[in-house]
Amino acid sequence: MVSVKVREGESIEEAIRRFKRECERNGVMQEIKKREFYKTPSILKKEKLAETKRKIRRKMFKDSKWSK
């Protein structure tokens, strides 16, 4: 859980900005977006497989293009 204490002499706007930065660093917003809709285990498996294929394809392209 992200928490920010307002420092002495700090405005609320500055504290909110610090809070937003901390949320970004900790991946809170990404987690919220990821959990916004339920995904069945089969869909998660397909997405993971597709991501793995993309990574392999990128690596092969990079290796073949730059190895010459």
Curated annotation (Swiss-Prot):
Keyword line: Ribonucleoprotein, Ribosomal protein
Q: Name one GO cellular component term.
A: ribosome
Supply the Gene3D superfamilies for this chain.
Ribosomal protein S8 (1.20.5.1150)
Molecular function terms, GO-annotated: structural constituent of ribosome
InterPro entries membership: Ribosomal_bS21, Ribosomal_bS21_CS, Ribosomal_bS21_sf
What processes does the entry annotate via GO biological process terms?
Answer: translation
Q: Which domain of life is it from?
A: Bacteria
Family to which the UniProt record says this protein belongs: Belongs to the bacterial ribosomal protein bS21 family.
Q: What is this protein called?
A: Small ribosomal subunit protein bS21
Organism, scientific name = Endomicrobium trichonymphae
